[in-house]
Amino acid sequence: MLNGEEVSEEIRQMQVSGYVSEVSANKQVRVEMVRQQQRMGQTENIVMDGRDIGTAVFADAQVKLFMTADPKIRAERRFKELRSKGDSVITLEEVFENLAHRDYADTTRKESPLVRADDAIILDNTELTQEEQLNFALEKAKPFLHVNP
C-alpha cells in the first residue's frame, strides 16, 4: 500500500527492481521501513516477505522461512512473471544479471544485510511448485496458528 493505494503490481516491475537494493541500503530508509513494518505486525499475526524480515524486522517471529532457489531457476521464474505482465523488452540475461546484482548488493550492504536467521527454516524451492511451497509453509506454521471458530 502506498498512501492508501494498492501498488503490489507496480513494485514488482523491473524498473523498480533495479533501484531496490540501492534505496534499501540507505540507513534512514532502513530505519523507517523497519519501524513501519514492525508497526504493521504489532496488533495481529502477519505474513511478511523481505530480505531482512527474519533478522531485523521480526527477529523474534515464531516461524521464519528462508526461501532460496537455484539462481537460473529464479531468473526464469522472474522472466516469466515479467513477460506475463506485458514486459516484452527485457531479456532473460538481464533478469539474471539484475537478480545477481541485487543478491550481491543485499548480502554485502552494511545496514540489515541479507542473511539467514539462525532459527530460520530453509525452503529450497528450486524444484517445488507454488502449491508445494505453500503446503510446506503451512505445515511449519500450523503449530502456531490460533484460529477462532
Locate the predicted segments by residue:
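Glycine-rich phosphate-binding loop of ATP-dependent small-molecule kinases
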Residues: 1-14, 18-19, 130-149
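ATP-dependent NMP and nucleoside kinases share a basic, alpha-helical "lid"
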Residues: 8-11, 17-24, 28-85
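Generic surface-pattern signal
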Residues: 21, 25, 100-104, 146
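A ubiquitous short alpha-helical element
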Residues: 2, 63-67, 123
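Short, glycine- and charge-enriched coil/turn segments that flank and shape catalytic ligand pockets
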Residues: 83-93, 145-149
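Small-molecule kinase domains that catalyze NTP-dependent phosphoryl transfer to phosphate-bearing small molecules
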Residues: 37-43, 51, 55-56, 60, ...
